[in-house]
């Protein structure tokens, strides 16, 4: 369901947020230039958060969009996958990419890119 919508958005080839990059056509994720090996659910979670960067997504919304098997679609499974995803994308970084909103859900934080900041200051 989510992936079908993703494929229809051909104009989005890649997502970049700080050291994190998602290459949609190849379904590949890079962190600090190195390819990360994500399980399909982790990849789908990451893409959903990336498509909604800066917005809090409720637990139920995430479960409805990412899980196809109702048996595994529960809050404890979501927490486990979110923990493993965080470990992979925040492993060697002081930057946090995924923020927990206790009792509500999760959101991806837009990371400030120092290159863009210096360009903005130079142009001002």
Region locations from a protein language model:
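Positively charged, aromatic-enriched patches within helix-turn-helix-type DNA-binding elements
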Residues: 28-81, 87-96, 102
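ABC ATPase A-loop
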Residues: 13-15, 96-99
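Compositionally biased, intrinsically disordered low-complexity segments enriched
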Residues: 3, 101-103
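A sequence-composition feature that detects small, non-aromatic residues
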Residues: 14, 50-53, 70, 82, ...
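A structural micro-motif at secondary-structure boundaries
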Residues: 16-43, 107-124
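Basic, amphipathic DNA-recognition helix from helix-turn-helix-like DNA-binding domains
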Residues: 1-16
């Amino acid at each position: 369901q989510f992936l079908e919508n993703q494929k229809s958005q051909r104009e989005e080839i890649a997502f970049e947020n700080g050291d994190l990059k998602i290459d949609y056509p190849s379904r590949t994720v890079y962190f600090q230039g190195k390819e990360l090996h994500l399980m399909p659910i982790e990849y789908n979670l990451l893409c959903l958060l990336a498509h909604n960067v800066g917005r809090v997504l409720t637990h139920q919304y995430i479960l409805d969009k990412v899980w196809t098997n109702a048996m595994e679609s529960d809050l404890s499974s979501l927490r486990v996958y979110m923990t493993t995803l965080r470990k992979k994308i925040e492993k060697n970084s002081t930057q946090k990419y995924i923020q927990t909103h206790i009792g509500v859900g999760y959101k991806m934080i837009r990371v400030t890119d120092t290159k863009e900041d210096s360009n903005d200051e130079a142009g001002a």
